[in-house]
Design a protein with these regions (language model features):
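C-terminal structural segments of small proteins and small subunits
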Residues: 81, 90-92
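Polybasic/polar functional segments that serve as interface/processing modules
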Residues: 1-34, 43-80
C-alpha cells in the first residue's frame, strides 16, 4: 500500500507523462481534513484534460491498485476532480 505522498507523486508523474502543465503536489494535511495532498495541473484543451485524468486513473490503478472514490466534471472537460480520499487531483 502506497503512502499519500507516494500516490501524489504517482499522480504528478502520470500528469507529466501526458504533457500536463503547471503540475503541483501540495501537502495540505495540516490545513484540512479533506485530503493529505492536492495535485494540480492544467491542460490546453478539453481533450487533453480528459487524457490527463484518464492517465492518472490508469497509473494509480496499475501501480497502486487505487480507484477514485469520486470523479467530478469529466463530461464537461473544463475542470475534473478525482478524489482518492488521501489525495485529490484537480485538472483545469
Amino acid at each position: 500500500m502506497k503512502t499519500p505522498k507516494e500516490l501524489a507523486l504517482l499522480a504528478a508523474r502520470a500528469l507529466s507523462d501526458k504533457k500536463g502543465k503547471e503540475i503541483q503536489a501540495l501537502e495540505i494535511a495540516d490545513l484540512t481534513t479533506l485530503a493529505d495532498y492536492f495535485v494540480l495541473a492544467t491542460g490546453s484543451s478539453n481533450t487533453q484534460i480528459n487524457a490527463l485524468v484518464d492517465n492518472v486513473e490508469k497509473v494509480l490503478h496499475e501501480e497502486a491498485g487505487e480507484e477514485p472514490l469520486h470523479r467530478e466534471g469529466y463530461r464537461g472537460g473544463t475542470w475534473v476532480l478525482l478524489d482518492y480520499g488521501c489525495i485529490a487531483v484537480h485538472v483545469f
